[in-house]
Amino acid sequence: MPLAVKSESGLMCCHSLPNEVMMPEFNEHILDKVLDPQDYRSDGSAYFMVWGRQHTQEQLDKLAKSWGVKLFCLGHAWVPGGIRAEFKNMLQLNSDHAKGVVLPVNLEKIQDATYTASMAIKLGSIRIDVT
């Protein structure tokens, strides 16, 4: 299973990103290499990509530049309203609870987190007819 998927236009979807304090130990090339057992350990870069919750704008900007990302779309954190745009280039969403959302994204033109979050659709508002 991949750690992340990235569109040519700059949307990266991943479970999480490393905590900011772990950046000195984080291998930014983790997405370009074959993972080895050390990457999965609690001090490994693959692990950091799954369990991080504390981010800063400076950190996000650095990773965005390194990876060619315009917008990070993350899960992992509990978001009571279903979606949150805490940083200009990172949003968090949940689809696994009563206020969960889905997010249509125009991959031809990636917008900032606030605009993109405004396009979220509450799962509870979607009607599915089963015949």
Language model region names:
Residues M1-W67:
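Active-site-proximal loop/helix segment associated with metal-binding centers of metalloenzymes
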Residues N19-V21, F72-R84, K99-V101:
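Active-site environment of divalent metal-dependent phosphoester hydrolases
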Residues M12, C73, L91-L93:
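Hydrophobic/aromatic beta-strand patches that form the interior of the parallel beta-sheet core
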Residues M23-E25, I83-M90:
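Histidine/acidic-residue-rich catalytic or RNA/ligand-binding cores of hydrolases
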Residues P2-K6, G82-R84, G100-L107:
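Short beta-strand scaffold segments in enzyme catalytic cores
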Residues A64-V69, P80, S95:
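Non-catalytic terminal accessory segments
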Residues K88-T131:
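Binuclear metal-dependent phosphoesterase catalytic core
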Residues E58-L60, V79, M90:
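Eukaryotic intrinsically disordered and solvent-exposed regulatory patches
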